[in-house]
């Protein structure tokens, strides 16, 4: 690569969205709907990640945890929430564990130890 050259290209689907103002953008279908994500819930979840980092060390969950452990914990936190327990943020804890299971599916599929999920293809955003 020569100096000043950009190593990245702007990807192009070949399809366009034309806005009422006349501006044009590439289509966004199939890329996910980032604008609809409930960011106030993500901010709440981020506090759970912050507290977990203090207890276990940041990125600990990325080292590899069996999916069964994440699912077990998520279910337990949902049950505690439904039972009215408010000793901790059980919904944030459940969300953390569901995201952890999804992370293992995507980055460390060998950690998926659930008998009915072993060896099965899981959703891959990047396909």
Descriptions of predicted regions:
Residues 1-127:
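Intrinsically disordered, low-complexity regulatory regions
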């Amino acid at each position: 690569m020569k100096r000043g050259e950009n190593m990245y290209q702007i990807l192009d689907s070949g399809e366009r969205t034309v806005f009422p103002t006349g501006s044009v953008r590439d289509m966004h279908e199939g890329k996910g709907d980032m604008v609809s994500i409930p960011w106030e819930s993500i901010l709440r979840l981020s506090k759970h990640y912050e507290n977990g980092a203090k207890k276990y060390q940041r990125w600990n969950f990325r080292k590899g945890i069996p999916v069964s452990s994440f699912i077990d914990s998520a279910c337990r936190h949902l049950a505690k929430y439904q039972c009215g327990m408010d000793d901790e943020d059980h919904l944030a804890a459940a969300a953390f564990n569901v995201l952890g299971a999804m992370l293992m599916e995507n980055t460390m599929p060998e950690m998926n130890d659930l008998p009915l999920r072993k060896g099965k293809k899981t959703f891959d955003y990047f396909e």
